[in-house]
Amino acid sequence: VNNGTKKDIYKAFTDLSKLTTTNDYVLIYYSGHGQIKAEQAYWIPTDGSENWGSGDWINIAEIDIFLTDIKAHHLAVLVDSCFVGSKFKGMNIIDSISMSDQSSEHYGKYLESALTLRSRSVLASGTTGQVSDTVKGTGHSKFALSILNQLNVFDKQSYPLDIQSMAVLMKGNF
């Protein structure tokens, strides 16, 4: 959904829950405004007003419910938005994964095993604070540029891409 309204985003999530099977791999990318009010995190769609309480913001708790309904074997959500990353339910702490874990001879076996398990991962540009906007001359945020750089690196690797590895490699780049 490009420049999605609240209705468009809800429809896209509903469609994903109907169309996906346990054999699917799904990537969701949200780039837009986010806000925290009353300790709740929100996505602000293109038709969202600046005023909280107008009913046109999307609570992250609602997104979590939509994600639960998507039947995909692996689901990754990349969020390039202020304030919302820490509010996703069951979010992993990436700091516990070190680069040495990735370079070990056991990493391939770890990935093989991980691919057999159903997964839900969220990688966000911000947790509870403001994140940077577009990098001059690129048309992309620092987060998006970091993702694109990592995709180029992983394209040349012999092992599959996983969100946890990507997060470790991106840490500190945006």
Task: Tell what function each PLM region has.
Residues 2, 44, 124:
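Residue-level detector of conserved, well-ordered beta-strand and adjacent loop positions
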Residues 7-31, 35-92, 158-167:
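Caspase-like (clan CD) cysteine peptidase catalytic core
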Residues 72-174:
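Active-site-proximal C-terminal subdomain of hydrolase catalytic domains
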